[in-house]
Amino acid sequence: MSKVEKKKLLIYAHYYIPDTASTGQILRELAEGMLDKFDVTVICVVPSYLGTVEDEYKTQRFYRESINGVKILRIRVPEFSKTNTVSRIKNILTYFFGAMIATFKVGKQDYVFSISQPPILGGLLGVWGKWMKHAKYIYNIQDFNPEQVLAVNFSKNKLITGAMMFFDKFSCRRSDLIITVGRDLVQTVHNRFKGKKVPKTVMINNWIDENEIYPVETNHPKVAAFKEKYGLQDKFVIMYSGNIGLYYDLENIMKVIEQVKPGTKTADGREVVFAFVGAGSVLDKLVVYKEEKHMNNVVFIPYQDKADLIYSLNAGDVHWCVNAKGIKGVSCPSKYYGIAAAGKAVLAVLEKDSEIRCIIEETHGGLCSEPGDYEAIAENLKWFIENAGTDKVDEMGKRSRENLVQNLTRDVSVKKYAEEILKL
C-alpha cells in the first residue's frame, strides 16, 4: 500500500534560523518537530535580524533553501537600523508585500500558520494565505497588539491603535484556530470579543529544548571563561538576559539596583554584581545611568551566540524575569524558559495571574512582586542577597528545572500543536 501523503503546512515566520529572534527559534523547532505529520514550507526574510544583510542575499528577490527537511522561501529585504523608524518600516513592509507574492510560489497548501509578528501584519498574512490557498488558518499569537503598544504608551494616537485593533480582530475572526501561549492571553481573546462569538482558542505553552540548556557546574571551563572575561568570578551574579527594550521597566529597576551599593557582600561573603546580557532600545540609557551614578557593580555584556547561551545563563546565580505593568495578557516573557532550563532561581517582577508568574508560584521557583512595587522588588532582592549560597535558593532552581522537563519541553508542546492543527 502506498504511503499516505502528508498534509502541507505553510508557515509565515518573518524571521527564521539562522536569525536569533526568539520567535524564529520557536518556529524552527515547531517546523522541524512536525515534519513527521506535515510537509512544511516556511516563508521568511533573508537573515537580517540585526539589520544587516549578507552580500549573498542581495542579488535576487527570492531564495529557495532547505534546512533539516523544511522547505524555505526567503524574501530579500533592505537593511535597517533599529534606531531609524523609517528604515524599520520599509524593511517590514518589504517583507509583508514580498510574502504576499511568495504565497503564489509555494504550491497547494492544506494549512496556513502565521504568528503575530510583525504586529498586525503577521495575522493579515495568514488571512491572505487562507484565501489564496483555500486552506485552514492557524493564528499563533505570541503577543497582542495594539494592547502591547498601549501598555507602554508607545502610541496614544487613537486612530492608529483603533485601526490596529480592527485589523487584528479581523485576523482573529478569519482564523480557524487561535493558539496562544498563556492562560492570561486566552483571556485577552475573550475580552476582545465580549458578548460576541469568540474565535476558537487554545493555549499551548512555549518551550525550550531542555537538552540544549541545562544546569552546568560553575567551575565548567566555559562558564569560568565567561565569568573571567566579564569580571564575574567569585561574585554573586544577579543576571538579566535578553532584550533590553521598552516592555520591561528596566530604567526603574536600575534605580532599585542602585540601592545595592558597590562592594555589598552576600551572607556567604561574595560581592554582589548585576549583569545585563543582551541589547535593545533602552541599553544606552542604562549605560548612561550606570556611569552617572558610579554603579561599578553593574556590567553590560553583549548578546551571546545561541551555542554559548547555556554558559552565560549558568553564570548567573539568580535571574530577573520582568515585565512592565500592563503586559499581563499581552505577551509572555520567553526568557523564563531559559532560566528554568538552567535550573536557576527567579527574581520575578510580573503581574498577578500572568502565565509565567503562575508557573513560578505553582513551582515555588522564585520570588514574585508586582511591576511598579519597587519596595517589594527591593525586599526580594535583599532576600536573595541574604540567602545566597543556601539550599533555599538552589531548591528554587531545581524545582523550576523539574517542572520544565515534565511540562514545558519541545516534544510536549510540538505534539500539542500537531494534534490541534490536525483536528481542524
Model-derived regions: residue spans:
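Nucleotide-activated donor-binding/catalytic signature segment of Leloir-type glycosyltransferases, i.e.
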Residues: 264, 269-271, 277-278, 283-308
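N-terminal subdomain of nucleotide-sugar transferases
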Residues: 1-68, 260, 264, 411
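A short, well-ordered alpha-helix in the C-terminal region of glycosyltransferases
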Residues: 392-407
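A short helix/loop element that forms part of the nucleotide-sugar donor recognition site in Leloir-type
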Residues: 58-63, 214-231
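Conserved donor-binding/catalytic core segment of Leloir-type glycosyltransferases
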Residues: 232-248, 254-258
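Nucleotide-sugar-dependent
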Residues: 248, 298, 305-311, 319-340, ...
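Carbohydrate-associated surface elements
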Residues: 46, 184, 204-207
